[in-house]
């Protein structure tokens, strides 16, 4: 048994001896297992946390890598784009340079061929002269000329035809862009600031909003309007763009007039509407013209206190009001601009079709026209010549338009004609500004309109003085009532506008006679026409004959138009002689001067050159100045003598025209026909013997 034990058995016995008892060993095993289990749980939780962090870190690194790759890709694309742009620019410059070189070569080739052609022509001439001098036969000369002609044809055939190439990089400006420039650069007459610049310094006390305009309180008006134009440019065609601009401006003006805000921006907005309307008449539809005319007439009626200024100052007024003018200036400008817009609307309507003209008018439009006419053409209040002129032009356009018969009746035109007769009874003069029987412009109304300028625009600087260029305000700057007097040139200018006003009234009556005929050719028309003609001729011969005025020719033209009107009304009336009983003698003398005052009936013993010198010496001086200028230009004595005779004949013709009050042959024949129908042949002979010295 002892032989069976070895060293391995001894090791096993020692290991068993060192082990604890079985119960104690089981407890230790269980506690060790629990400890190992807790440790494993804690290590598993920590491992999972580390795994999540590692995963998030890996995702972050992946995202950073992808973003870096995208950034590099974008940089590569941008560099490629820059290289492509540089390549295209270089290609364009190369093509332009090549094109210029080709043009230069073609020009040089053309010049060389032209020079060769000239040399061939000179060579031919020299050969022909040499053959003639040497006495060569004509056959040789013909052969040489044939050879030269063949060379010339060959040269002409070899010429390269040049064509104008198209510039593909040129950008053609569209209608909307032109309209935008037209609106942005708009300035009032005599003003240095654009209307948009003025509106940039004007604000509203309360906010206002339209379909495409949103204006906060205290903010300038110019920027929203400019932004609206920029948006419309890229969204709509020209006609729709103009309609939307007019609609939004009208809505904005209406909100200002109905609210409690100051009317500071109203005249500038109305002027902006006029500018939009005047860009291209063909792009404005009839319904837009109708809406704009109705809006302008309603707005003008709101300013009727300006049109109802009393003729005489009330003795009850103490005159202690402040000497400021800015608010009256704003209302005056708004009134002038409204009438200018109405006038432009009816003038554009003349270019439309007859159906469109009829569709323009309705009862509301016609009532507004009647109301505006009653306010502007009145004798109960002080007349404003700017407004009167616009109203007469509106009536002139209405007389040429095709209007509905139920609205444009003979009775309505009779009332309008009676107001025109009131204008005939008022002379045109600025000599006395307190005389209400004259048509004149007051110094406070010496402002330019949108269609015309009746004065010299002396007060135009006051419009810019309303604006504070360093701030944005809702009220205007203070303007005092201090107006300079009219100059002599300005008075002559206003007189000329007044004569044009009278001429426009005569044209209205002529047009109405063509339309209605005998219905309007009543006794009052004949009486007023004869009375006006006699007065104008007397004024021309007695007062204006020796006056140095540029309006004498216009007065003669007015007299000719009155003779035509008198003749047409005379032909339409059944018993015209009874209508002129009160002014018959004056009319006979007037017509006699027209018929027999021509140079063909002049006494041969008189000296017309002396009469012309006595009549208007200043005109003779102007002709002498022209003669001196012609002498400096022409050196030939024959030409100088011819020009001297022509200028002298022109001076005599002007003298004869002023003496007779008429120079047109047709007018003399019309006056002769009327004169013969007034008096008999025996009375004509007696009158001739009484008025012509033997």
Swiss-Prot record:
The keyword Nucleus applies. Residues 1-13 have a biased composition (Acidic residues). Keywords: Chromatin regulator, Coiled coil, Cytoplasm, DNA damage, DNA repair, Nucleus, Phosphoprotein. This is DNA damage checkpoint protein LCD1. It comes from Eremothecium gossypii (strain ATCC 10895 / CBS 109.51 / FGSC 9923 / NRRL Y-1056) (Yeast). Residues 68-130 form a coiled coil. GO terms for biological process: chromatin organization; DNA damage checkpoint signaling; DNA repair; establishment of protein localization; telomere maintenance via telomerase. InterPro entries: DNA_damage_chkpnt_Lcd1 (IPR018622). It holds the Pfam family LCD1. It is found in: Cytoplasm; Nucleus. GO terms for cellular component: ATR-ATRIP complex; cytoplasm; nuclear chromosome. Residues 1-26 are annotated as: Disordered. It comes from the Eukaryota. Forms a complex with MEC1.
């Amino acid at each position: 048994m002892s032989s069976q034990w070895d060293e391995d058995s001894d090791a096993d016995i020692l290991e068993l001896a060192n082990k604890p008892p079985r119960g104690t060993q089981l407890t230790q095993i269980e506690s060790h297992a629990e400890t190992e289990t807790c440790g494993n749980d804690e290590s598993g939780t920590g491992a999972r946390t580390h795994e999540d962090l590692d995963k998030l870190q890996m995702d972050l690194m992946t995202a950073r890598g992808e973003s870096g790759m995208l950034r590099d890709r974008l940089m590569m694309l941008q560099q490629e784009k820059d290289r492509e742009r540089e390549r295209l620019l270089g290609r364009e410059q190369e093509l332009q340079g090549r094109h210029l070189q080709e043009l230069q070569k073609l020009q040089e080739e053309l010049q060389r061929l032209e020079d060769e052609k000239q040399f061939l022509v000179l060579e031919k001439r020299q050969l022909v002269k040499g053959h003639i001098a040497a006495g060569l036969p004509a056959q040789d000369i013909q052969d040489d000329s044939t050879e030269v002609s063949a060379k010339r044809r060959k040269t002409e055939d070899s010429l390269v035809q040049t064509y104008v190439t198209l510039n593909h990089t040129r950008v053609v400006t569209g209608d909307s862009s032109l309209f935008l420039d037209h609106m942005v650069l708009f300035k009032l007459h005599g003003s240095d600031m654009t209307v948009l610049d003025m509106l940039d310094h004007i604000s509203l006390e309360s906010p206002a909003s339209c379909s495409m305009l949103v204006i906060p309180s205290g903010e300038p008006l110019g920027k929203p309007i400019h932004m609206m134009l920029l948006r419309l440019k890229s969204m709509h065609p020209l006609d729709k763009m103009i309609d939307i601009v007019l609609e939004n401006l009208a809505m904005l003006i209406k909100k200002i007039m109905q609210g409690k805000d100051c009317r500071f921006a109203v005249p500038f907005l109305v002027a902006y509407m006029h500018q939009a309307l005047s860009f291209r008449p063909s792009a404005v539809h009839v319904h837009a013209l109708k809406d704009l005319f109705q809006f302008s007439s309603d707005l003008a009626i709101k300013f009727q206190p300006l049109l109802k200024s009393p003729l005489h100052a009330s003795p009850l007024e103490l005159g202690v009001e402040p000497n400021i003018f800015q608010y009256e200036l704003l209302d005056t400008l708004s009134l002038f601009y409204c009438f200018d817009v109405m006038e432009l609307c009816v003038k554009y309507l003349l270019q439309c079709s007859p159906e469109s003209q009829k569709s323009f008018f309705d009862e509301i439009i016609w009532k507004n026209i009647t109301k505006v006419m009653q306010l502007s053409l009145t004798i109960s209040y002080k007349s404003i010549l700017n407004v009167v002129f616009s109203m007469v032009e509106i009536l002139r356009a209405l007389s040429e338009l095709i209007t509905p018969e139920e609205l444009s009746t003979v009775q309505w035109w009779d009332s309008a004609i009676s107001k025109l007769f009131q204008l005939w009874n008022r002379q045109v003069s600025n000599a006395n500004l307190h005389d209400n029987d004259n048509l004149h412009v007051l110094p406070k109304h010496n402002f330019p309109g949108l269609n015309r300028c009746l004065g010299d625009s002396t007060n135009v600087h006051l419009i810019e003085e309303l604006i504070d260029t360093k701030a944005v305000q809702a009220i205007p700057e203070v303007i005092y009532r201090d107006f300079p007097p009219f100059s002599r040139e300005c008075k002559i200018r206003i007189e000329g506008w007044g004569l044009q006003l009278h001429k426009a009234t005569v044209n209205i009556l002529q047009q109405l006679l063509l339309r209605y005929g005998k219905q309007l050719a009543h006794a009052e028309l004949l009486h007023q026409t004869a009375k006006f003609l006699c007065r104008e001729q007397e004024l021309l011969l007695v007062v204006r004959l020796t006056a140095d005025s540029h309006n004498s020719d216009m007065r003669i033209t007015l007299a000719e138009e009155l003779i035509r009107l008198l003749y047409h009304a005379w032909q339409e009336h059944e018993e015209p002689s009874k209508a002129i009983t009160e002014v018959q003698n004056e009319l006979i003398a007037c017509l006699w001067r027209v018929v027999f005052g021509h140079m063909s009936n002049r006494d041969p013993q008189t000296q017309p050159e002396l009469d012309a010198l006595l009549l208007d010496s200043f005109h003779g001086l102007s002709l002498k100045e022209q003669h001196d200028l012609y002498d400096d230009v022409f050196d030939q004595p024959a030409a100088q003598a011819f020009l001297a005779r022509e200028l002298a004949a022109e001076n005599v013709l002007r003298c004869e025209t002023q003496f007779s009050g008429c120079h047109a042959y047709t007018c003399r024949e019309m006056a002769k026909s009327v004169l013969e129908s007034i008096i008999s042949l025996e009375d004509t002979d007696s009158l001739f013997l009484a008025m012509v010295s033997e």
